[in-house]
């Protein structure tokens, strides 16, 4: 009876060691799975944070810049303008390019806002009107591939017919007026241009 008892105790010790090994392996597996899950969650959080930061930067910075430092005032009678110290602007035009590192800008989804001492008006691009006839503003690609998107190394001319009735809320642009023009893309900060107009206009005045 004692021999059998000792054998039973040896078997119990052996079983206990095997059980401990199984439990240890289980702990290792669980720890590995937990680490993998936490690592994956960390990568996801990092990617999500990067995406949020990138989106914030795009929304806070402008993708358009003025090409050169001037805007041009067409004060000819053909543009319904008038020259001299009591003149008025017929059309305003200027050139824009994409900023370094900026995102492409779809001009068909862009709006122009004008602020004067008289008032404020914002108008989106209208592709159903005829440039130079009944459009409040339009664009032409001077260096580009002919589409509606401003991309790297491209230059677009934006023309604003300030005498178009849709701009009636801003009044006339006369000598010595202060005018702010904003080009507002669908994403990102606007390109803001503020100018004080000269005391007298010629047929083509740049400021």
Curated annotation (Swiss-Prot):
Please report the propeptide residues according to the UniProt annotation: 1-14
Write down a Pfam family by its short name: Arch_flagellin
Q: Does the keyword Disulfide bond apply?
A: no
Q: Which GO terms describe its molecular function?
A: structural molecule activity
Q: Where in the cell is it found?
A: Archaeal flagellum
| Keywords assigned by UniProt, alphabetized | Archaeal flagellum
Keyword Transcription regulation in record? no
One Gene Ontology CC term in the entry: archaeal-type flagellum
The record's principal subcellular location, in a coarse class, is other
InterPro entries attached here? Flagellin/pilin_N_arc (IPR013373), Flagellin_arc (IPR002774)
Q: Which GO terms describe its biological process?
A: archaeal or bacterial-type flagellum-dependent cell motility
The function of this protein is: Flagellin is the subunit protein which polymerizes to form the filaments of archaeal flagella.
Entry's family note: Belongs to the archaeal flagellin family.
What is this protein called in UniProt?
A: Probable flagellin 2
**Organism of derivation:** Archaeoglobus fulgidus (strain ATCC 49558 / DSM 4304 / JCM 9628 / NBRC 100126 / VC-16)
Its gene? flaB2
